[in-house]
């Protein structure tokens, strides 16, 4: 995993997310993967950006999401690019669902547990404050834990 200062070619956000950092910097993240070792390397490489750092990624999927997640360092923008997506937030124990179609977006407030379900093939773009992101298996109807509880410090 490495941050690239200048990428002259097109970037596929599905395989190469872009880190938005302090000073309005945008750096492609080559070799990014959703495994603990790479996430740790990414977190270390962008630590100086703190809560102001953002990761821009496109996800393609089909069906329900596996996990609840929350981002205590900042809000997350979720944009539906294609298909239909339902974002479910846990608001004081009550599910709050937002259905998105192509071109529609929603903002998950900082610290709010949320999950994303795709009704058939769909794509989303996310802009995420990754510092301190927490994940919980989606084995129950809602996540456990409180908004202030600490968790793994990965994007």
Predicted segments with their positions:
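Ligand-binding loop in jelly-roll beta-barrel domains
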Residues: 101, 110-135
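Short, surface-exposed beta-edge/turn micro-motifs
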Residues: 53, 74-77, 122
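Short acidic-glycine-tyrosine-enriched beta hairpin
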Residues: 92-110
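A short, N-terminal "cap"/entry segment at the start of jelly-roll beta-barrel domains
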Residues: 1-68, 144, 149-155
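Short, conserved beta-strand element in jelly-roll/cupin
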Residues: 72-87, 127
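Short histidine-centered beta-strand/loop micro-motifs
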Residues: 45-47, 65-72, 89-90, 97-98, ...
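Short peripheral tails and domain-boundary helices/loops at the edges of structured domains
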Residues: 132-149
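Short beta-strand segments in beta-sandwich/barrel cores
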Residues: 66, 83-89, 104-105
């Amino acid at each position: 995993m490495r941050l690239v200062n200048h990428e002259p070619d097109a970037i596929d956000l599905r395989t190469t997310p872009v880190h938005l950092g302090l000073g309005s910097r945008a750096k492609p993240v080559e070799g990014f993967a959703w495994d603990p070792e790479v996430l740790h390397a990414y977190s270390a490489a962008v630590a100086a950006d703190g809560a102001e750092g953002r990761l821009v990624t496109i996800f393609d999927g089909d069906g329900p999401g596996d996990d609840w997640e929350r981002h205590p360092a900042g809000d997350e923008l979720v944009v539906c690019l294609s298909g239909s997506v339902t974002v479910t937030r846990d608001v004081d124990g009550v599910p709050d669902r937002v259905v998105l179609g192509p071109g529609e977006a929603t903002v998950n407030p900082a610290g709010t547990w949320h999950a994303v379900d795709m009704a058939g093939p769909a794509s989303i773009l996310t802009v995420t404050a990754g510092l301190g992101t927490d994940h919980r298996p989606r084995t129950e109807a809602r996540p456990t834990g409180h908004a202030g509880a600490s968790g793994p410090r990965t994007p």
